[in-house]
């Protein structure tokens, strides 16, 4: 989860968190088929493992898609050291909708693939790279579809901006070594782009699984409970409560 700024937390709490507050749908409808196509497009490059040709080609594609929807795109490049001393040429992609708005929301996901399928039930595949359709591509696909629908609706308020951040070098870590994971996100947190701050953020991770259900995550409830409740309530009111059970997980 992402920790809220205190002002945002207080304002959210003042607005109330119960289900009696209506949440009106805004903007054009999210298209699941479009998001699926964006997932498939990323996978068509092959596993997007660090320093690979597939990784480089997918980076260019993601940037071009965000730009095609009129978003302002910047990259944050860094050479980051992996667990075995390998240097990862990492690129965080930052795509801004309505970049001049002072009130901003951060939406993020990682876009790289894990180089080893070490959790595959078939042990013969443990040294093969992961295609990462769900764990990586699905989150980026949701962000691309959100960028598409936001850019398509000219009636939306210009007072709110959204920054979509695709984190790199996420998934080459080792179990038991927390610092070896999320290298791109760690770099982003330590080198926050100048002039950007957010009222709150949402991290999308493994959101494309068949029959997926999303429970309220513990760290998010600890640091941003009012926002979590608003998101889950909005899902229920929009008819998607079966995907967002009203329970912690």
Range-by-range predicted roles:
Residues 127-226:
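Acidic/histidine-rich catalytic neighborhood of metal-dependent amide-processing enzymes
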């Amino acid at each position: 989860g992402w920790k809220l700024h205190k002002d945002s937390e207080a304002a959210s709490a003042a607005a109330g968190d119960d289900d009696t507050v209506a949440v009106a749908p805004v903007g054009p409808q999210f298209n699941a088929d479009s998001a699926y196509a964006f997932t498939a497009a990323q996978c068509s490059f092959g596993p997007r493992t660090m320093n690979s040709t597939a990784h480089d080609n997918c980076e260019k594609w993601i940037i071009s898609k965000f730009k095609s929807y009129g978003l302002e795109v910047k990259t944050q490049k860094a050479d980051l050291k992996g667990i075995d001393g390998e240097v990862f040429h990492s690129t965080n992609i930052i795509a801004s909708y309505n970049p001049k708005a002072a009130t901003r929301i951060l939406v993020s996901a990682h876009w790289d693939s894990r180089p080893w399928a070490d959790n595959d039930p078939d042990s013969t595949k443990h040294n093969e790279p992961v295609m990462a359709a769900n764990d990586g591509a699905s989150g980026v696909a949701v962000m691309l579809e959100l960028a598409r629908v936001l850019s398509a609706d000219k009636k939306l308020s210009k007072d709110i901006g959204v920054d979509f951040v695709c984190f790199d070098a996420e998934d080459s870590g080792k179990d038991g070594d927390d610092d070896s994971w999320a290298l791109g996100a760690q770099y982003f947190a330590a080198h926050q782009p100048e002039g950007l701050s957010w009222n709150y953020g949402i991290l999308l991770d493994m959101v494309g699984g068949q029959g997926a259900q999303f429970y309220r995550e513990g760290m998010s409830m600890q640091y941003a409970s009012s926002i979590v409740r608003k998101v889950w309530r909005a899902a229920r009111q929009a008819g998607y409560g079966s995907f967002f059970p009203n329970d912690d997980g």
